[in-house]
Amino acid sequence: MPSDLPTPDAALRAVSAPEHNPLGTAGLEFVEFASREPKALGETFTKLGFKAIARHISKDVTLYRQGEMHFLINAEPDSFAERYAEEYGAGICAIGIRVANAQRAFDRAIELGAWAFEGERLGAGELLIPAIQGIGDSHIYFVDRWRGRGGQRGGLGDISIFDIDFRPIEIDTAHADLSHVGTGLVAVDHLTQTVGEGRMQEWLDFYRDLLNFREIHELHANWHVSAESRVMVSPCGAIRVPLYEEGTRRTNLMHEYLPDHPGEGVQHIALATDDIFACVEQLLANGVEFVEPPPRYYAQLDARLPGHGLDVERLKRTHVLVDGEIGADGVPLLFFQTFVRRGAGEIFFEIVQRQGHHGFGEGNLSALAQARAES
């Protein structure tokens, strides 16, 4: 079943509703990573099914592609990314948000109190992409050039930033690389962020006032947030940001599955797939390791979600957790998730699939805690 993320066409339609979407937000254009060991991070991306398809024309930045995702590894010396990696280790140092007009979006954000990011040096022929400072020393870029914006797949008047600022690694496969399937990961489902103790409201206001995000319960009335988290969603529906506040009570189990980010910033990134079982089986074949839930977790599943209709043995083999509910019509509304085993100083990845459920696995934390207690 397809994921619940809006299609590119649906995200583009949101641009034409200025009363709800004044920036013309239309999804994520890229996620930028910094690391003290960029080569090792690139190898991780390759295991996850991404392909290095282009390099920046003037900087040591590599573009990786899979599904609708663009991941950048910024290894430029004496750059913001290098300083970020020295301070925080491997992490997400910036995101690029598609908007109707980048300069207008930037100017509006500055007028509302955002701080400008002055950016790095520009090489010859390189685009100036406006950006503001985001959470935890990260940056948010506003991008108004992306493929498909004009209803086409490339061509004059429909050129992305990657057509201008990057050069293909393999000319012969450049066009095919734009549709790289990899392991079946298709999009970024959400970016979980930690905020400083006592600063939750400040960051809620940041997303609401500057970017026009809304809390998820405003969009899905039957969705209940936990006392320790809030979830913000972009006007186009394609960007989800769960927020957790530092200093709140965390169990040892949550630390294992959701390790703390050192300071404010992106704690982990969740990647969506349309078939989590096939995807994870391919990832396992690629050498990716996953956190293994206690066996008791699966023994409780029938009682917790009667009528789920799932192959429990396959869930076990792939280390997949499932949360959700059975709808009034008897149709299961499910959220699948599994966590890539994370080494010290590595990026934390989650793999998810949605079947009509808008949650983030809240029920799995209590189910895992119970399973641990009974094991």
Predicted segments, located by residue:
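An N-terminus-focused feature that recognizes amino-terminal "leader" regions
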Residues: P2-R149, G155-T173, T318-L321, Q337
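TerminUS-proximal long segments
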Residues: P2-V15, Q337, R341-S375
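Vicinal oxygen chelate
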Residues: A26-S35, E82-D107, P130-I132, V186-E197, ...
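Conserved active-site tyrosine of GNAT-family acetyltransferases
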Residues: L41-T46, A109, F206-R208, L283, ...
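Beta-rich nucleic-acid/ligand-interaction surfaces
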Residues: D60-V61, A221-V233, Y297-G307
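Acyltransferase donor/substrate-recognition loop-hinge adjacent to the catalytic core
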Residues: I140-T194, R214, A238-P242, R249-E256
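Beta-propeller domains
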Residues: Q193-D205, D209-P242
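Long compositionally biased, domain-poor regions of proteins
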Residues: I239-L243, P262-R341, I347-R354
